């Protein structure tokens, strides 16, 4: 059968559309998308003010971390409540961007850190298979996944945990070096000096606590090597959930 120019055009358009659909499916990588939460914790006796904390994802996307408890000085080392309001699944992170001020050593820390991508993906796959996903949210449908917890300890020490049911994996441990903040890091309503921004960042820290910290209280603590006790603290809850059929994980 002889093809005329119009038929050739239609065939070319069909091939183009099919190629576009295949490309979108491959680039979307649905098999590498998961629900997860991202939070930051710090020791209660080492106040921090987080300027930025977020994960960089493939395709120029990003995922912000929940920093509210840290910036309100309500954080407890190793303790985080996993929640997420994702409207859609996300690719897994490749890097962490972090910028924060530390009250007790009067330093500013900033860095971009590479994450162990293969280890993260493997952990998610295994946790899904072993039914270790946490219930992160029931908003607009139930969302199950794992929780990234970024720990900012004293002396510039940083740790990242990945958590699920009876699951806690240390992904990264790093000691950051103090840096001089850039002009953009000192902006709040207007450009501030380092001293003025520091005053703003910690203005809600009570004078009584400032006095306690100046006296050296908890000054020799080594939080980066302190076990989080995450599994120990949640064991009773998980046992109850197992017994009553709320989770399917079998230990």
Name every feature range the model reports, one short phrase each.
Residues 53-102, 249:
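Tryptophan-paired
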Residues 25-38, 98:
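Ser/Thr/Pro/Gly-rich low-complexity linker/stalk segments immediately outside membranes or between
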Residues 1-6:
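Positively charged n-region of N-terminal signal peptides that target proteins for export
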Residues 38-50:
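Structural motif
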Residues 101-109:
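Short acidic/polar inter-strand loop motif in beta-rich domains
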Residues 109-137:
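Short beta-strand elements
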Residues 7-25:
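Hydrophobic membrane-insertion alpha-helices, especially the h-region
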Residues 16, 140-251:
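Activation corresponds to long, low-complexity, non-globular regions
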């Amino acid at each position: 059968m002889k093809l005329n120019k119009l038929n050739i055009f239609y065939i070319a358009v069909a091939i183009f559309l099919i190629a576009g659909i295949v490309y979108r499916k491959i680039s979307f990588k649905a098999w590498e998308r998961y629900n997860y939460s991202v939070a930051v914790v710090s020791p209660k006796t080492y106040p921090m003010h987080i300027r930025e904390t977020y994960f960089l994802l493939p395709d120029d996307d990003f995922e912000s971390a929940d920093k509210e408890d840290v910036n309100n000085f309500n954080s407890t080392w190793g303790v985080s409540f996993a929640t997420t309001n994702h409207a859609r699944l996300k690719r897994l992170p490749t890097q962490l961007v972090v910028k924060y001020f530390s009250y007790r050593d009067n330093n500013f820390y900033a860095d971009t850190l590479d994450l162990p991508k293969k280890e993260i993906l493997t952990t998610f796959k295994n946790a899904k298979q072993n039914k270790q996903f946490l219930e992160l949210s029931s908003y607009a449908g139930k969302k199950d996944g794992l929780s990234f917890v970024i720990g900012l300890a004293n002396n510039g020490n940083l740790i990242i945990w990945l958590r699920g049911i009876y699951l806690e994996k240390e992904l990264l441990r790093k000691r950051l070096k103090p840096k001089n903040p850039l002009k953009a890091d000192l902006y709040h309503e207007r450009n501030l000096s380092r001293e003025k921004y520091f005053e703003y960042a910690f203005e809600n820290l009570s004078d009584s606590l400032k006095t306690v910290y100046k006296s050296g209280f908890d000054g020799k603590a080594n939080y980066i090597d302190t076990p989080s006790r995450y599994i120990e603290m949640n064991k009773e809850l998980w046992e109850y959930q197992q017994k009553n059929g709320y989770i399917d994980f079998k230990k």
